[in-house]
């Protein structure tokens, strides 16, 4: 039967999309179109009578607890694999938490420590699974490190520790042609002044890291040279140990010990083993490309030319070590070079050596301390510093105001700073002028009056008339705009006026009463107190004629315009007085 079914042909039903045998296809097609329908969502064939149930059970929209909407048939798979609020178990404490909070909880829970029963160390909880693999190995490594002496291996070189020293050494070596430093024999080690150091001195912190770095750099260079020349390995190893001992002994020593001829006290090695020390031997080496320096025109090897030109440049910062001469420089002893370098390094001249100083130091400059703050400055800068010094006392700023007298008429609320800033113009009277001339007003002023002097400055007279009033010794107030004459002048004028009333006066001796404006010169400054404004009737005129007496009670008042009127000729004034 199976073979028969396999051999027979089949056709695809258009309704249910299934393969139907050919001999049953007609019956199936009629039955399928009548009773079976296809779901429009999932495209699966279902009986038409069960289509509504299928749509309600499988394809209705539901909401998950994570507020996501999806079909009901997909809810189960979403809740098991995709929902962020599904429960999960912590791998450290077996506590069920939502997936959203699980990561934060595991980080916190895994940071706890538990005591290992095997090695006795506190181990993190998150490392408990991998700890048995390394348990006990840390203690073995520590024991191994303690068993190995420090001299058995070289300390790894730190770039940030020796960078400064290496750069300085390169610049110093570039000053002169490269040469090998003379070795120091081991028998000189016992004669070294630093050999008698105690254990406490060896444990002190290094006060001169620059010297130590220099020794270590030199030690590394000697090690490299020893690799290039195996025949001198014994000498180089001895020199290496000796330089290491020097670097250890130099720690914690005072600066004075370095300056007391440390480099001269050590005996030099055999000159025969020191290698070439002359400039001609080094430059005459075979198979070397020599190029001239663009500054000093000397020949140097190709690999050292850049370093030499950097140090030979006149604008380079190494002015203290480089003489700047364009001539051929002599070969200097390396011990002298290192000694000068150490002395400059210990005297706080690192900025000059490294090229960090902004400008060269001022030579032959006098350093004087500030008298207020004590800061030591150069002579050229000290004057400007003391003028603006913060420590300067307050009394030093009021020297210019000591000679100014106090002002009586100044209001109380006027600040001293405001009065100090007021500018005094030429010709103005000072505010304390009246206080200075009070004693003179008591004695009585004496003036040399010239009767023939005419008024030629009305403005000066008006300024004198409008001066402010001041205190007076007597109770009587003076007339406005009239200056008080002394006793002798007033008696002469009164006598002449009385003589004119009694009889005729000769034309040659006519009394003249001059206007008050022309009694004094235009630049005359009075030195007596002024009275308050009042009324004075010296120029009063009545209908019957001019009165011959001066009466303060019955006197009239002339306006300012009448006072400013130009004076008459002297002859006309005399004739008018004779008519009266």
Swiss-Prot record:
Induction: By lipopolysaccharide (LPS), IFNB1 and IFNG, IFNB1 being most rapid and potent inducer (at protein level). Not induced by anti-inflammatory cytokines, such as IL4 and IL10, which also inhibit LPS induction of TRAFD1. PANTHER family: TRAF-TYPE ZINC FINGER DOMAIN-CONTAINING PROTEIN 1, TRAF-TYPE ZINC FINGER PROTEIN-RELATED. GO terms for biological process: negative regulation of innate immune response. The modification Phosphoserine is found at residues 278, 320, 326-327, 409, 415, 430, 450, 469, 532. Residues 395-453, 468-509, 524-580 are annotated as: Disordered. This is TRAF-type zinc finger domain-containing protein 1. Expressed in skeletal muscle, brain, liver, kidney, spleen and bone marrow. Expression depends on STAT1. Signal peptide: none annotated. InterPro entries: Innate_Immune_Apopt_Reg, TRAFD1-XIAF1_Znf, Znf_RING/FYVE/PHD, Znf_TRAF.
């Amino acid at each position: 039967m199976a073979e028969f079914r396999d051999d027979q042909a089949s056709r695809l039903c258009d309704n249910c999309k299934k393969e139907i045998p050919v001999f049953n296809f007609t019956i199936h097609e009629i039955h399928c179109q009548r009773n079976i329908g296809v779901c429009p969502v999932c495209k699966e064939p279902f009986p038409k009578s069960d289509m509504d149930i299928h749509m309600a059970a499988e394809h209705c929209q539901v909401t998950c607890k994570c507020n996501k909407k999806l079909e009901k048939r997909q809810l189960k798979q979403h809740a098991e694999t995709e929902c962020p609020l599904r429960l999960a178990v912590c791998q450290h404490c077996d506590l069920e938490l939502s997936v959203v909070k699980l990561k934060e909880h595991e980080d916190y829970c895994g940071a706890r420590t538990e005591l290992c029963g095997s090695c006795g160390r506190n181990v993190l909880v998150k490392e408990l699974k991998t700890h048995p693999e390394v348990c006990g190995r840390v203690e073995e490594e520590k024991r191994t490190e303690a068993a190995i002496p420090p001299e058995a291996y070289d300390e790894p070189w730190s770039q940030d520790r020796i960078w400064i020293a290496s750069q300085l050494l390169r610049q110093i070596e570039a000053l002169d042609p490269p040469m090998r430093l003379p070795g120091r024999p081991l028998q000189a080690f016992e004669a070294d002044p630093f050999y008698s150091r105690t254990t406490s001195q060896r444990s002190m912190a290094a006060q001169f890291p620059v010297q130590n770095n220099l020794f270590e750099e030199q030690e590394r260079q000697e090690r490299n040279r020893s690799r290039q020349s195996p025949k001198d390995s014994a000498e180089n190893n001895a020199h290496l140990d000796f330089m290491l001992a020097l670097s250890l002994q130099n720690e914690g020593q005072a600066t004075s010990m370095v300056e007391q001829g440390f480099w001269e006290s050590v005996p030099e090695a055999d000159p025969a083993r020191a290698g070439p020390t002359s400039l001609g031997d080094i430059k005459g080496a075979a198979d070397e490309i020599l190029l001239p320096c663009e500054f000093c025109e000397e020949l140097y090897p190709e690999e050292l030319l850049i370093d030499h030109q950097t140090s030979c440049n006149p604008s380079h910062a190494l002015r203290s070590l480089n003489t700047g001469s364009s001539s051929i420089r002599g070969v200097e002893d390396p011990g002298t070079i290192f000694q000068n370098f150490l002395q400059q390094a210990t005297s706080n001249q690192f900025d000059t050596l490294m090229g960090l100083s902004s400008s060269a130091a001022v030579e032959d400059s006098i350093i004087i301390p500030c008298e207020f703050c004590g800061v030591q400055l150069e002579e050229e800068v000290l004057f400007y510093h003391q003028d603006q010094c913060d420590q300067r006392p307050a009394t030093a700023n009021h020297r210019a105001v000591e000679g100014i007298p106090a002002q009586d008429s100044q209001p109380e609320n006027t600040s001293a700073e405001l009065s100090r800033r007021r500018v005094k113009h030429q010709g103005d009277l000072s505010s304390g002028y009246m206080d200075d001339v009070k004693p003179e007003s008591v004695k009585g002023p004496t003036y040399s009056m010239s009767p023939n002097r005419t008024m030629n400055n009305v403005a000066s007279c008006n300024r004198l008339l409008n001066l402010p009033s001041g205190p007076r010794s007597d109770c009587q107030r003076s007339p406005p705009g009239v200056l008080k004459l002394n006793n002798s002048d007033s008696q002469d004028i009164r006598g002449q006026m009385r003589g004119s009333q009694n009889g005729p006066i000769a034309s040659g001796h006519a009394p003249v009463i001059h206007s008050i404006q022309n009694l004094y010169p235009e630049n005359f400054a009075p030195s007596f107190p002024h009275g308050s404004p009042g009324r004075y009737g010296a120029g009063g005129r009545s209908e019957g004629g001019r009165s011959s007496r001066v009466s303060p009670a019955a006197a009239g008042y002339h306006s300012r315009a009448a006072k400013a009127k130009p004076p008459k000729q002297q002859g006309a004034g005399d004739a008018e007085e004779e008519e009266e």
